[in-house]
Amino acid sequence: MSAIAPITGSLKKRIMKDIAVGMGLGTVLGSYWWWGFHKPKIAARENYYTQLAEQKAAEE
């Protein structure tokens, strides 16, 4: 019997931790991009084209 117990399962724990951290960060950053950048840009574009259509309808 050795004085120090062997380290078992460390690779599996490391892989699971890496996957969990990667999925968590990916979800958080993806959500930030979607709600913080993409949605406001799309809303601004939609507002622009709505105003443009209203102006065109008013001219006719």
Swiss-Prot record:
GO terms for molecular function: oxidoreductase activity. It is found in: Mitochondrion inner membrane. The chain crosses the membrane at residues 19-37. The lineage of its organism: Eukaryota, Fungi, Dikarya, Ascomycota, Saccharomycotina. This is Cytochrome c oxidase subunit 9, mitochondrial. Component of the cytochrome c oxidase, the last enzyme in the mitochondrial electron transport chain which drives oxidative phosphorylation. The respiratory chain contains 3 multisubunit complexes succinate dehydrogenase (complex II, CII), ubiquinol-cytochrome c oxidoreductase (cytochrome b-c1 complex, complex III, CIII) and cytochrome c oxidase (complex IV, CIV), that cooperate to transfer electrons derived from NADH and succinate to molecular oxygen, creating an electrochemical gradient over the inner membrane that drives transmembrane transport and the ATP synthase. InterPro entries: Cyt_c_oxidase_su7a_fun. Coiled coil: none annotated. The gene is COX9. Residues 38-57 are mitochondrial intermembrane. Pathway: Energy metabolism; oxidative phosphorylation. Its main location: mitochondrion. One of its GO terms (cellular component) is mitochondrial inner membrane. Belongs to the fungal cytochrome c oxidase subunit 7a family. It is a single-pass membrane protein. Residues 58-60 form a propeptide. Residues 1-18 are mitochondrial matrix. It comes from the Eukaryota. Keywords: Membrane, Mitochondrion, Mitochondrion inner membrane, Oxidoreductase, Transmembrane, Transmembrane helix.
